[in-house]
């Protein structure tokens, strides 16, 4: 297994003979509007990509989009990723978003799927700690839904990408059911006046205690 965190939630993972690109946000630094948060008017992305987009895409077999918010699937990704690339998404809303950009092989992960020698399992996510955030997310981004993804293959550790979530029953269930050995958690506790969007420090500790053997 080779895992390269590129920026934010964007990760390139070579695993079980397949190379995955997870949540590609490929825009140049500062070219996207600020996201709704207590950080105010910081433009996104906050940092440059560490390597060229061409190098990021080199060798990629499949793209996984945990949800279609712009920091996980942006116009730059839609333009750069080949249109025949398989794209794994969470639901019909996100499938429609990706298909609208011309992609021809968009697959909804509803439970379990097989990619080569790798088994993908959907894990539920909850992108808010207060139901009051749902209308805001839907108004600004089109959706409040998100998912996590668990990857398994022979001879490699089980890997769990939490996606954008807070601690809730679904996350705890994924830890219990899949017993991941590697956990890639989207953290930072990002908040709006209506509530929190991501795992905070205390919840990361909670994950660590729930899965003490995991990295």
Regions found by a protein language model. Give the residues of each.
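A short helix->loop->beta-strand "cap" motif at the edges of active sites that frequently abuts
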Residues: 18, 83-86, 103, 211-215
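Pre-active-site segment of Zn-dependent metallo-hydrolases
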Residues: 18-64, 75-80, 129-134, 167-177
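Active-site neighborhood of phospho(di)ester-bond hydrolases with catalytic His/Asp-centered motifs
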Residues: 22-23, 59-68, 88-91, 159-165, ...
